[in-house]
């Protein structure tokens, strides 16, 4: 049997001090083994320092750095989470109008024995796969496929679980010709009408209308290092300052992090990620997600269909409310 292939880690810029420390630990171990010297005490101190440094780095990430984590090539995807948390699931294809968009996937499954419908944006793992899935940017056919599956869920009384991970809806000429804006708008309208619980989770990046197309729900959840924004920081910087190089400044101003959105009352719960991000321990992350989804589903299933629709409507009506000073 062939030995398992170990993937080379993909490092982010701000992780370099940590990597240098870990490489130093490895070098000391190697030298100690070659020379039969006991340096266990020194290694123990360095390992403790590495853990502390990792904790310091990931607890003080800037919005721009969180975007890097949200876009990490090995961050768990929609299909990763569905396969990890579901008892079983069957992917369903097509919008029944000649399209099957691979950038938006969905199907029927079971979560803790309960039938549900899963939906989500799907990015690729490498360049070839990303081209196939259009980098997670869904077309009108993708949103119409999502609507078909959500209508199926509503008809048979199955909760809807959506996973958001897209830089935005596909903005090509072909998408506009096929009615991208209309497809997203119809989804927004219909999601307010459904009588089943809807849980929306931002698992990576939630970009603009592309995220909203499957983002109207009774609860909005976000992973700790995910982002949710009206426009990418690069696009925002290009529009406001005519300089994409100011993306970090735009990321700060846009209030895109889970912490920011929780303070603004947009987000219902932040799902904690393992130290180092979701990609560092995907199975642990998936189990955390599963527990949170089950808890919220239990709360929502205690409500009548009319209560669900009314609370969902009021949740979105209250977004953007602010008070002006009388001074």
Swiss-Prot record:
GO biological process, one term: malonyl-CoA biosynthetic process
InterPro entries: Acetyl_CoA_COase_a_su, ClpP/crotonase-like_dom_sf, COA_CT_C
Superkingdom per UniProt: Bacteria
Molecular function via GO: acetyl-CoA carboxylase activity; ATP binding; carboxyl- or carbamoyltransferase activity
GO CC annotations on file: acetyl-CoA carboxylase complex
EC nos: 2.1.3.15
Pathway(s) this gene product operates in, as recorded in its UniProt entry: Lipid metabolism; malonyl-CoA biosynthesis; malonyl-CoA from acetyl-CoA: step 1/1
UniProt keyword Lipid metabolism present: yes
Subcellular localization, as worded in the UniProt entry: Cytoplasm
Family label: Belongs to the AccA family.
Complex and partners: Acetyl-CoA carboxylase is a heterohexamer composed of biotin carboxyl carrier protein (AccB), biotin carboxylase (AccC) and two subunits each of ACCase subunit alpha (AccA) and ACCase subunit beta (AccD).
Biological role stated in the UniProt entry: Component of the acetyl coenzyme A carboxylase (ACC) complex. First, biotin carboxylase catalyzes the carboxylation of biotin on its carrier protein (BCCP) and then the CO(2) group is transferred by the carboxyltransferase to acetyl-CoA to form malonyl-CoA.
Record protein name field: Acetyl-coenzyme A carboxylase carboxyl transferase subunit alpha
Source organism of the structure: Synechococcus elongatus (strain ATCC 33912 / PCC 7942 / FACHB-805) (Anacystis nidulans R2)
Gene: accA
């Amino acid at each position: 049997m062939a030995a398992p292939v170990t993937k080379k880690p993909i490092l982010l810029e701000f992780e370099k001090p940590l990597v240098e420390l870990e490489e130093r630990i490895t070098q000391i171990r190697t030298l100690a083994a070659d020379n039969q010297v006991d340096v266990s005490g020194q290694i123990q101190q360095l390992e403790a320092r590495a853990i502390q440094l990792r904790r310091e780095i990931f607890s003080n990430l800037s919005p721009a750095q969180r975007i890097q984590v949200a876009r990490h090539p090995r961050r768990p995807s929609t299909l990763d989470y569905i396969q990890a948390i579901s008892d079983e699931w069957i992917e369903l294809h097509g919008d029944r109008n000649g399209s099957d968009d691979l950038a938006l996937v969905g199907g029927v499954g079971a979560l803790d024995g309960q039938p549900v419908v899963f939906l989500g944006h799907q990015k690729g793992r490498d360049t070839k796969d990303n081209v196939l899935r259009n980098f997670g940017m869904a077309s009108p056919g993708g949103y119409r496929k999502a609507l078909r599956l959500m209508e199926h869920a509503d008809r048979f009384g199955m909760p809807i679980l959506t996973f958001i991970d897209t830089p935005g809806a596909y903005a090509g000429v072909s998408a506009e010709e096929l009615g991208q804006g209309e497809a997203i708008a119809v989804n927004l309208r219909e999601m307010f009408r459904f009588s089943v619980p809807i849980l929306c989770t931002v698992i990576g990046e939630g970009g603009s209308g592309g995220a909203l197309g499957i983002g109207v729900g009774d609860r909005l959840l976000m992973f700790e290092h995910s982002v949710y924004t009206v426009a990418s920081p690069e696009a925002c910087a290009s529009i406001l300052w005519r300089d994409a190089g100011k993306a970090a400044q735009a990321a700060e101003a846009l209030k895109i992090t889970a912490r920011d959105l929780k303070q603004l009352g947009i987000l219902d719960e932040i799902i904690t990620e393992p130290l180092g991000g979701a990609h560092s321990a995907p199975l642990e992350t998936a189990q955390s997600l599963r527990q949170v989804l089950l808890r919220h589903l239990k709360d929502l299933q205690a409500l009548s269909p009319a209560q669900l629709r009314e609370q969902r409507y009021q949740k979105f009506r209250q977004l953007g409310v602010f008070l002006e000073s009388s001074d």
